[in-house]
Every structure is written in C-alpha cells, then in structure tokens.
A protein has these predicted regions:
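Helical "substrate-binding/catalytic lid" subdomain
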Residues: 43-144, 148-172
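Rossmann-fold dinucleotide-binding core
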Residues: 1-52
Length: 172
C-alpha cells in the first residue's frame, strides 16, 4: 500500500515485454525492493491472483488454528510463537498475525484498520476462481477461502483488513 511505496518495500509482479520492464524498472525500484517479471502481458495478474489465493488460504487457516487454541485455553501469543517456529510457520505468523494484541504493527492490533481490504481479497479470489474455471484447474482450498471471505464481507467487514477473518472464527 501507500506505506510500502513510501518505504520502498513493495513487491511488484510484472507482465509484459522485456523492453517495457527495462523502461518501468527505475520507477518500480523507487517504490519496491522485489520486482518479478512473470512473463508476457497478463502474467503479472495471474501471478498476483495465485499469490493472493494462497495468502487467503494461509490467513484463514492461521486464524482458525489460533481460535481453536484460544478456545482451548492457550495464550494466542504463545501459540503464535509455537506455530511460527514449527511446521505451521507462515507469513501471517511472521509479520501479519490476525489475532488482536499479538503483533503490534499488524492491522489486528489496530482494529483491523489499514492494510488489504476484505473486499479486495474477495475481488482477487473471484478472479482466481474465474481463471480456474477457464483452465479447468481444481482449486478447492481457494474456493473454500473465497466462501469464507464472502461470508465475512457479508457480515459487514468488507472495508477492513483481510486478517479480520479472525472475527469469523471468534465466539462473542
């Protein structure tokens, strides 16, 4: 987002000709640290929706596991550290924990304000599902994650960060 661009930490996934990438590289390097050339025009979009589909699966699975632990009496910070250092370790546990109060810079500790909106995740998951349909690719995990995010958005959380999927699993 804006903070990433200002800090020069964005990741760019680019599709297009080598010549176009050479021309765009100085601008991209001013805002990002990772620039990937995915292939021809359109390849960057495909790579992005694949990445975001995986991210939605990881985030919803992380939120579900954290809630199971909390509901069984575990401290979410302790469980997060155990999973982070074990085979369940993933990006959400490393830098974007969905459980409030576990990771101060994460949106979960700011009432899920800022970050990547649920509505945008739903859009990208819709694009991923359309691509899967076009290619005949089985995406049962992506489809389930999309259903979870659509339900979460329908519950009024479309305009907050996608890590707020944690709320879908919480008992009030």
């Amino acid at each position: 987002g804006v903070a990433g661009a200002q800090g020069g930490t964005l990741t760019f996934i680019v599709g297009g000709s080598d010549t176009a990438l050479v021309q765009a590289r100085p601008l991209l390097e001013a805002m990002g640290k990772n620039i990937f050339h995915a292939g021809d025009a359109g390849a960057g979009q495909v790579a992005k929706i694949c990445n975001n589909m995986l991210l939605s699966v990881l985030m919803s699975g992380t939120a579900e596991a954290l809630q199971l632990g909390v509901d069984n009496g575990l401290d979410p910070s302790v469980l997060s550290e155990i999973m982070r250092k074990s085979s369940g370790g993933n990006w959400a546990l490393e830098v974007y924990n969905p459980y409030p109060g576990v990771m101060e810079p994460a949106p979960a500790s700011r009432d899920y304000e800022g970050g990547f909106l649920v509505d945008l995740m739903i859009k990208d998951l819709g694009l991923a599902m359309a691509s899967a349909l076009d290619t005949g690719t089985a995406t049962p995990m992506g489809s389930l994650a999309r259903s979870l995010y659509v339900a979460h958005g329908d519950n009024g959380f479309g305009q907050v960060d996608f890590s707020s999927i944690q709320k879908l699993f919480q008992r009030d």
